[in-house]
Amino acid sequence: MKVVIFDMDGTVIDSGEAIYKTVNEVRDELSLAPLDKEFIIKAINEPGRNLALEFYGIDTPSKSLKEGFEEKFKKFYDECATTYDGVKELLQKCKEAKFKIVLASNAPHDTLEKILKKNEIYELFDEVIGASKEIPQKPDPAMLHLAVSKTGASKAIFVGDSLKDELSAKNANMPYVQVCWGFGEESKTAAYNVKNVSEAWEIILNF
């Protein structure tokens, strides 16, 4: 049995506008000029960057700043986050092919169901896995290992858009597909790069 594991933001869900608006609303409150959307998106997808320092000039953000960010992000995420074109159809094809489908996101586990249901794709996933105290964020491979164990699959492939995703797949010794329709750029080290869902489907079908 095959399992196809999908990252969420930048792969299934386009949350770029929500992230962009949140960062710049916080910056506005700190009397800072807005940042370019492309810079913000690239920064959040690269491991090891001090985002508080780069976005707000603060080395260690206060609890109130963190809470303010989370509150604003939830608001904008609910307003702006949508599925990328063709992704729902891709998930349906996986379902019709009798593949198991799992979502593995660095977002907190308790926030995932709402956005997936809003975009009418929640029921297409066999398992939904988010970060929690017990499950570390990618690039740790724990989520991918959990996806395999929960579905009992003998073969697995991970579809994502960032270096964190690619490293997570590498750490799990799993084939990886880098999508370039969202936040992601072509990876020189990924086994597969895809520009659209048709290309993604060909790889998923034949791995």
Walk through the language-model features, giving the residues of each.
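Conserved Lys-Pro-Asp/Glu-containing loop-to-beta segment of HAD-superfamily phosphomonoesterases
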Residues: 3, 137-166
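Short, acidic loop-to-helix structural element flanking the phosphoryl-transfer center
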Residues: 75-103, 109, 113, 138-141
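Acidic, Mg2+-coordinating phosphoryl-transfer loop and its flanking beta/alpha structural elements
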Residues: 157-192
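Glycine-rich phosphate-binding loop signature in dinucleotide/nucleotide-binding domains
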Residues: 96-99, 150-154, 207
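N-terminal helical cap/lid subdomain that shapes the substrate entry/recognition surface
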Residues: 2-89
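A short, structured active-site edge motif that brings together acidic residues
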Residues: 40, 122-137
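Short acidic-hydrophobic, aromatic-tinged amphipathic segments that line or gate anion-handling sites
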Residues: 192-200
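Surface-exposed amphipathic alpha-helices with a cationic face
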Residues: 88-96, 148, 166-170
